[in-house]
A protein has these predicted regions:
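Negatively charged, low-complexity tracts enriched in Asp/Glu with abundant Ser/Thr
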Residues: 3-64
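Amphipathic, interaction-prone secondary-structure segments
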Residues: 45-103
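A cross-kingdom feature marking charged/low-complexity
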Residues: 73, 132-141
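A short, surface-exposed interaction/processing loop segment used at functional sites
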Residues: 97-132
């Protein structure tokens, strides 16, 4: 049994959190769709009008439910290929010993498979002013 789930099967989060995750997914998928070239041959489309790799990306995007502090977002979760970390979302507020406070919903870039980068949040899913790419949360500027 996989520890990865789709958004609709995610438990332990309220509707506001899940709605914010839905908005985040849409932004990620829009970024991937802009990245993909126009469909003009090659593999046949699974979904009419969609590039097959875009469909595959959407269908294999999932959530790792095993973390205590963070929700890990993964690509390739349900496919036969490699699974990669897209990023992390903070589950509850905490303050690091350095004084940086992280809030519920903060987007965190991956520092590795099990660890988010804790130098600064890249945005918050409850605010509308964050930017993401299909490869992960944006770098700091």
């Amino acid at each position: 049994m996989s520890k990865y789930v789709k958004l609709n099967d995610l438990t332990g989060f309220d509707e506001e959190f899940k709605n914010a995750l839905g908005e985040l997914e849409q932004r990620i998928f829009e970024s991937y769709n802009k990245f993909m070239p126009a469909k003009d041959g090659g593999r046949p489309s699974i979904v009419e009008g969609e590039h097959p790799m875009f469909t595959e990306f959407k269908e294999n995007f999932g959530y790792d439910t095993g973390g205590r502090k963070y929700l890990r977002l993964v690509t390739g979760a349900f496919g036969e290929g490699q699974t990669s970390v897209w990023g992390f979302i903070n589950k509850k507020e905490f303050t690091k010993s350095s004084g940086i406070t992280f809030k519920e919903g903060d987007l965190l870039k991956s520092a590795g498979w099990n660890t988010p980068a804790l130098n600064k949040p890249r945005g918050n899913i409850f605010n509308d002013d964050y930017k993401v790419n299909w490869t992960g949360p944006n770098y700091l500027r």
